[in-house]
Amino acid sequence: MDDDIFKEARKERDDFEELMNACDLAKMSVKNNEMVHGLETFGINGESSENGNKEKPKEIMKVVAPTVEAYVGSSSAQTPTKSSGGALDGSDQQEVRQDGTSVQKDDNGFVFYKCRFCGLTFNFMNTLRAHERIHDVSQPYVCGKCGDSFEFACQLEYHAAQHSEIDGYKCECGRTFFSYTEMLYHKHTDDPLELIGAPETTTIKVSKKRVLPVSEQDLPQPAFVTEGYEPKHPLRVYNDVRSKPYICEYCSKSYSDSRGLAYHMYSHRGEKYFNPRASRYMMGREGVGYTDSRSYYLFPRTSGYVTPRF
């Protein structure tokens, strides 16, 4: 039983090796533009034959890989040259857009975009635009009608609309503009170099006479030197006011604000013994000060009490 399993496994392994060899031969034949039948020992139903006495096929089909004719630009001449070995056929349809980009379409319906500088083809227009940046061209987008070049594709699209039948300001050269200033200041190929609307050149005579320095007496004097300075608004005159105008009437101590004088007046109540609640540290505490109702009997008001004014 085990021998049968091993024999079947070896047979499958040998069949797999023959299949891989056949695939390698097929790849090489496609690469060399021809198909060579190398499965003489391979049966019709996919079963290998050890004797090799199976009947060979009568006809061998020759498969030729599709060739491509792409135009490669040359530095010496502007005329394109053909080179084969791409993915398109020479009989493909080719269309040249307004910006100079050539679009090729093969028999299967695939569209390819060809670079106008080196001839490489790409599947997408965005890939072609990204590739064209490596050629270091300042204005790669060229109009197919008037030949003007632009730096960005959006500028070319805006310019291409001027050649179409649109409402706007039309020039004698055939271009149409959206605004009057664009139509007025646009240039033609046969225009002179001077700017349109520039003023006429005038000659100015410059004297080479030596200029003497101006003395201070000849300089004009400002009005405030001769007439005096008078400000727009009258200056504020401050009276002789003390820095501490709040003065106690009992001990003549002065304070800068009324709140400080009010706290000072608490010291003239006439307490007979020391109470920590009457100290200056506890005066600012909420609920234990002199204004609290609970401290009324602890600190009786004497005849010398003065009502604080806030």
Swiss-Prot record:
Sequence ranges of Polar residues compositional bias: 73-84
SUPFAM superfamilies: beta-beta-alpha zinc fingers
Domain-related comment: The N-terminal part (1-106) mediates the nuclear localization, while the fourth zinc finger is required for the localization to M-lines and dense bodies.
InterPro entries linked to this entry: Zinc_finger, Znf_C2H2_sf, Znf_C2H2_type
Disordered: region residues: 73-102
Transcription among keywords: yes
Effect of disrupting the coding gene: Disorganised A and I bands in body-wall muscle structure. Defective extension of body wall muscle connections or arms towards the ventral nerve cord. Double knockout with madd-3 results in severe muscle arm extension defects.
GO biological process: locomotion; locomotory behavior; muscle organ development; myofibril assembly; post-embryonic body morphogenesis; regulation of transcription by RNA polymerase II
Keywords: Cytoplasm, Developmental protein, Differentiation, DNA-binding, Metal-binding, Muscle protein, Myogenesis, Nucleus, Repeat, Thick filament, Transcription, Transcription regulation, Zinc, Zinc-finger
Protein's name in the database: Zinc finger protein unc-98
Pfam families: zf-C2H2 (PF00096), zf-C2H2_4 (PF13894)
Self-association and partners: Interacts with hum-6, mep-1, myo-3, unc-96 and unc-97/PINCH.
Zn-finger segments (C2H2-type): 113-135, 141-163, 169-188, 246-268
Entry comment describing in which tissues the protein is expressed: Expressed in embryos from 1.5- to 2-fold stage in myofibrils. In larvae and adults, it is expressed in body wall muscle, and in addition, anal depressor muscle and vulval muscles. More specifically it is found in the thick filaments of muscle fibers.
Region Interaction with myo-3, annotated ranges: 198-310
Cell location: Nucleus; Cytoplasm
Any one GO cellular component localisation term in the record: myosin filament
Source organism: Caenorhabditis elegans
Molecular function in Gene Ontology: cytoskeletal protein binding; DNA-binding transcription factor activity, RNA polymerase II-specific; RNA polymerase II transcription regulatory region sequence-specific DNA binding; zinc ion binding
Job of this protein: Probable transcription factor required for muscle structure. Its dual subcellular localization suggests that it may function both as a muscle adhesion complex protein and as a transcription factor, or work together with transcription factors, to influence gene expression. Thought to act as a molecular bridge between unc-97 and myo-3 at the M-line of muscles, possibly in a signaling role. Plays a role in the formation of muscle connections, also called muscle arm extensions, between the body wall and the motor axons in the dorsal and ventral cord.
